[in-house]
Amino acid sequence: MSIEYTPGPLLDAARNTPTALWNDSSDPSELAQSLSFGSVGATCNPTIAYTCINQRRDVWLPRIAELAKEMPNATESEIGWQVVRELSLEAAKLLEPIFEAENGRNGRLSMQTDPRLARSAKALADQAEEFHNLAKNIIVKIPATSVGVEAIEEATYRGVSVNVTVSFSVAQAVTTGEAIERGLKRREAEGKDTSQMGPVVTLMVGRLDDWIKEVAARDKMFLDPGHLEWCGVAAFKRAYQEFQKRGLRARMLSAAFRNVMHWSEFVGGDVVVSPPFKWAKLINDSDYKVEERMDIPVREDIMKTLLSIPEFVRAYEPDGMTPEEFDTFGGTVRTLRGFLQADADLDALVRDVIMPAP
């Protein structure tokens, strides 16, 4: 595959810093353009998959009708998830040359485990292994919940490269990073290969911003609103420091963009940034001059504001929450509910194809 690169800040950062660019979409046309910006990976989740299917209804609605005939005993959900598999594999194929060139560190397509399995560690690990076996460059998303922590370690032990998701806090990042490390060490103790595994731990920086803004409004806190744009940035930088200090091999990944700092503040770190395509295009079309900012602390006055918010402190401190508390954190609940709704929307889309309203 020959890539015609598009000059711009993203390409500059990709070529001149350790920071890897992924694309927060598995739509093949968007991914192809993102590769020209220097992208070396892609992510997907139920919401993204549903959006991608709707963007190419001319392709996927007829395919849903075909699958209904090929799978006469399948449920709406099973047909919908087969479409997700096929969509993901189409995108994964575009990334295979990068995967081979980088020995598995990049060139991966993220598939997400079914959010309806979130209560069972075994079901999550089993589905992660199934997705892992679909293509050599699949990485599998598992949520940073109390159940997910167990599934993350087990899936890693089975050889699955995991992308931790539904993660908003330093505590979630560190806890899941350590779970990945335990899984890797268990494999290595048994002489099993880990050389091509490329785990990442996502921190959904924009969704943390969203949640802390909600809390500040709910609690009628008088704050500089501009400072709240830095919640995710501050947490991500803290988590990155903890990973370095603890020697965790998984890379941090920045996702859920709300502003350009969710890329620019992390440039220079050995991390992954995964903007949606519209954000990637906005950044690459700009005249921004790339500067390595990963190790530059958030300003003291901003941190003073953020640390006055108890909910932010929970997200910022490495021991700010227990795994059981991950499950009830506002960002976790809101995001899982959103993913479950996207699953329900996909079911409804399949239903409209195979049983259109009269």
PLM feature segments, named:
Residues L31, A128, V149-I152, A173, ...:
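Generic hydrophobic/aromatic pocket-lining and core-packing "Φ" positions
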Residues M1-S29, Q33:
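N- or domain-start disorder-to-order transition segments that initiate the globular core
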Residues S161-E292:
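Catalytic alpha/beta core domains of metabolic enzymes, predominantly
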